[in-house]
Amino acid sequence: MRYRKGSEENHCERFQEAISVSASSGVPAAYYSFRDDYQSIRMTAEYGGTIRIESIITATGEQGELTQHPQGLIQFRTRRITDSESNLNETCEGPTLLHIVGQDEDGFNVHLESLLARMLRGRSMITLTRNTEAYLRDNTHMLTTVSRDRVNDLVNQLKSPKSSLRRAAVRQLSSYGSSAVPLLRSTLARHDLDPEQQARIKSILANRVRIDDDTPTSLAQLLAADRDHWQILARRMDQTQFVAANDHVLRCGLESLSP
């Protein structure tokens, strides 16, 4: 990874911001802060480590925090400052920001939308999520179907004593593209995998990282076999869309969606 150590600050009448990049034992870390009349934000990120974004709304004191630990889910929570326990506090988690926005769009909009729009060069994370969800609802029949049982069979094949079978399993899993990513991630929770299987799965997942801009179509394929996301989306489906989505989930070998 290429990076440049140093610090930079920007102050004007409307806002103040600062960024600092350092390194310890060759591992870079970044710290960013932003403040205007609306909110203050702090973001810390260590390469290969934990990412944390903290937000405080100036007028209300409402707090938002997004955290992702290495190889872990993204966690997002908002807290209202009250004298008693508030049922307005929200906590959700998921493997992608689309899962987070799908569960707490209002909280994300209050605390993180403006920051993410700057990081995405003006693109709205909420708009991208809405368009992806619309594509999933309206084009369920066009999505790639990858069976969980087939993925598990190929993962088992990764520990075959024959190298030709192991290579064939890697090629087949890789050929599924991003549609197999949620299923491959879930297999890492299995307790019967040997170190070589785990390493091969992680290598396949690492090779699935894309450097081009995400689109609703590409993100929909990534989420095609993600039951958790389908369940989040089910709350905003009509009956016809729900039936089509549930049929697709069952074809992927996943559990039926809850109505």
What is the predicted function of each stretch?
Residues 1-259:
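Extended repeat-based scaffolds of very large eukaryotic assembly and lipid-transport proteins
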